Amino acid sequence: MDFSGIAGKLTADAGVSADNFLYVALYISFVNSFLEEFFFRGFAFISLKKITSRGFAYVFSAVLFALYHAGMTAGYFNFGVFAITLGGLTVAGVIFNFLNEKSENIYTSWLVHMFANFAINTVGFILFGMI
C-alpha cells in the first residue's frame, strides 16, 4: 500500500495541507466527531431503538456509520482494503451503540470517537511531515 500519495490526494481533493492540517485535525476530533455521534448514535440508534427493534437500530446505525466513513476513503485504497475498512467501521459502530445503550446518551461514544480521531490524525501529521 502506497501511503505517500495520500497527503497529495487530500490536498488535491479536499484542500487539506500541512498548512491547515492542525485546524482540520482539531475540527475532526472535537466538532465533527460530536456531530457524527449526534446523528449516528443520538438519532439513528437511541431514537430509532424506541420505535423499531433493538437489533434493527444496532445494525442500521452501525452500517450507516460505516458507509459514511468508507465513502470518504473510497478511491484511496484497493477494494480489499475498502471492504476491510467497511467491516471494521461496522464493528466500531456496534461498539459505539453498545456504549450508548448503557448510558442512554452519546457522550461515551463521543469520547471514544474523539480518541480514535486523535490516533488517525496522528497518522495525518506523519503523512504531512509535521511530526
Each model region followed by its residue ranges:
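Membrane-interface helix/loop boundary segments of multi-pass membrane proteins
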Residues: 35-60, 101-105
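Short juxtamembrane and helix-loop transition motifs at transmembrane-helix boundaries
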Residues: 15-24, 44, 69-77
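Small-polar-interrupted transmembrane alpha-helices in polytopic inner-membrane proteins
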Residues: 57-70
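Functionally important transmembrane alpha-helices
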Residues: 59, 79-131
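Active-site His/Glu-centered metal-binding helix of metallohydrolases
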Residues: 34-39, 43-44, 67, 71, ...
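Residue-level hotspots within the lipid-embedded alpha helices of multi-pass solute transporters
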Residues: 29-34, 66, 85-89
